[in-house]
């Protein structure tokens, strides 16, 4: 058969004959072929079919004749081979991997670490399925990324100093919820305290210590002399824990008020030139615009990414000066009339009363919520239509028509979300949560914050009527 080409070359019968022929070969031929240590056969050598000379009566289907050493052993990659090699590893030298790296081990995350199968050599009878031999340090420990490893590393982090978490103050605020329900202890928080708590937690990422701290509760002995009172650092303007209403104002009122005025102009232009809005009578248009101009403006300013900062004013006179500077520049010096001089003071007092810390924080929270959702241009337009066509307003005569407009706007928004291949229910819930925050924004606060330095004592209702009748 040797030296001839047979049609059965490669067939099952040919392989059986060749395997039976190799059993009677001399051992010198096998040793001359390769004198290195056998690591298992990964080639296509045929399995040994005979049972002669096999120790212990091992399963013949798992034994292969290696093409490197010529001996019968399990094939590399087989189940029996993996079990035998894993059983040999605990008895091998463990000092070799330690010389590889001298750094402390943080867990093995590679694919070379084999799980320990047997229980021999494990301290305190640990579960071997969770212990891996690390390729960095050669020790047995939980694998990095496992549940046990996470529990152990989290338990070790409790012993770290308290200065470490301060590095995470600039965390992702958009990953937190903006819901104001169930905040605080069993007594609950008031509306102003709840908004202040939300601002401290989600915007500033810090909490101010209360006055009743550990240092104040420490008893003082009789022989100790009371220390000199130190001046406590003043809390920021948004801290309402003291319960004192502090006067606040815009840090850059001219730039912010001009941006808000431009946003109001774009909002009224968007509403006025809607075909379904133009067919309404003027009185019905006024009912809609006067009730929803502030929420529409908030959506417009959020779309324009308006950023504004507040600052605390130590003296009320300074706040009055900032609120009336813009009007004095446009109208000139005011006459020396007692009644004329009392009017700006009244506006200033109302402004200091309306501009509460919680109200300003509600506006900022709404802006941050919209920015975190990445609302596109069409979604902003459909949200404005949903806010504009509100059939529950008092004084509306065409309620059915307004209901149909609101329903149609919501249907178009639904089609747009599905067209963008988004999860409809999740995206709708996110947009509804943003609209829910508009309920905490007061119209008077928007007027005093963005428009009072410009319009003075003019009513915003008169401004709406004038802008609807004018050609924008």
From Swiss-Prot:
Motif LXXLL motif 3 mapped to chain: 148-152
**What keyword terms does UniProt attach to this protein?**
Cytoplasm, Nucleus, Receptor, Repeat, Repressor, Transcription, Transcription regulation
Q: Which SUPFAM superfamilies match?
A: Nuclear receptor ligand-binding domain (SSF48508)
Region annotation Disordered: where it falls in the sequence = 214-237, 326-345
**Which family does this protein fall into?**
Belongs to the nuclear hormone receptor family. NR0 subfamily.
In terms of PANTHER family, this protein maps to: NUCLEAR RECEPTOR SUBFAMILY 0 GROUP B, NUCLEAR RECEPTOR SUBFAMILY 0 GROUP B MEMBER 1
Give the protein name, as stated in the record. Nuclear receptor subfamily 0 group B member 1
Q: Lineage, please?
A: Eukaryota, Metazoa, Chordata, Craniata, Vertebrata
């Amino acid at each position: 058969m040797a030296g001839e080409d047979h049609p059965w070359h490669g067939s099952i019968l040919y392989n059986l004959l060749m395997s039976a022929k190799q059993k009677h070969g001399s051992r010198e031929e096998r040793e001359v072929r390769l004198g290195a240590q056998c690591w298992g056969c990964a080639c296509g050598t045929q399995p040994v079919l005979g049972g002669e000379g096999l120790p212990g009566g091992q399963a013949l289907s798992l034994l292969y004749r290696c093409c490197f050493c010529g001996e019968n052993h399990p094939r590399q990659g087989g189940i029996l081979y993996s079990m035998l090699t894993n059983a040999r590893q605990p008895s091998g030298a463990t000092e070799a991997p330690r010389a590889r790296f001298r750094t402390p081990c943080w867990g093995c995350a590679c694919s070379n670490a084999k799980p320990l199968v047997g229980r021999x050599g494990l301290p305190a009878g640990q579960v071997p399925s969770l212990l891996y031999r690390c390729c960095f340090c050669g020790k047995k420990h939980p694998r990095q990324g496992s549940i046990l490893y996470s529990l152990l590393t989290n338990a070790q982090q409790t012993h770290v100093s308290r200065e470490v978490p301060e590095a995470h103050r600039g965390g992702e605020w958009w990953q937190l919820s903006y819901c104001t329900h169930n905040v605080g202890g069993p007594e609950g928080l008031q509306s102003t305290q709840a908004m202040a708590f939300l601002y401290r937690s989600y915007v500033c990422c810090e909490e101010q210590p209360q006055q009743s701290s550990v240092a104040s509760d420490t008893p003082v002995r009789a022989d100790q002399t009371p220390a000199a009172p130190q001046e406590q650092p003043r809390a920021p303007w948004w801290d309402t824990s003291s319960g004192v209403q502090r006067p606040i104002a815009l840090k850059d009122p001219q730039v912010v008020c001009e941006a808000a005025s431009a946003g109001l102009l774009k909002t009224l232009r968007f509403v006025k030139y809607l075909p379904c809005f133009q067919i309404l009578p003027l009185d019905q248009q006024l009912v809609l615009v006067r009730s929803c101009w502030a929420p529409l403006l908030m959506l417009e300013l959020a779309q324009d990414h308006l950023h504004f900062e507040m600052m605390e004013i130590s003296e009320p006179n300074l706040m009055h000066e900032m609120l009336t500077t813009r009007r004095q520049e446009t109208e000139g010096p005011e006459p020396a009339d007692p009644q004329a001089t009392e009017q700006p003071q009244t506006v200033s007092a109302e402004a200091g009363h309306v501009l509460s810390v919680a109200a300003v924080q509600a506006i900022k929270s709404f802006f941050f919520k919209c920015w975190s959702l990445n609302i596109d241009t069409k979604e902003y337009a459909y949200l404005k239509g949903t806010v504009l066509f509100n059939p529950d307003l008092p004084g509306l005569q065409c309620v059915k028509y307004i209901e149909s407009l609101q329903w149609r706007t919501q249907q178009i928004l639904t089609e747009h979300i599905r067209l963008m291949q988004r999860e409809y229910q999740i995206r709708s819930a996110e947009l509804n949560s943003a609209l829910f925050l508009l309920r905490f924004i007061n119209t008077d606060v928007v007027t005093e914050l963005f428009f009072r330095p410009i319009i003075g004592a003019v009513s915003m209702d008169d401004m709406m009527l004038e802008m609807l009748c004018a050609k924008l």
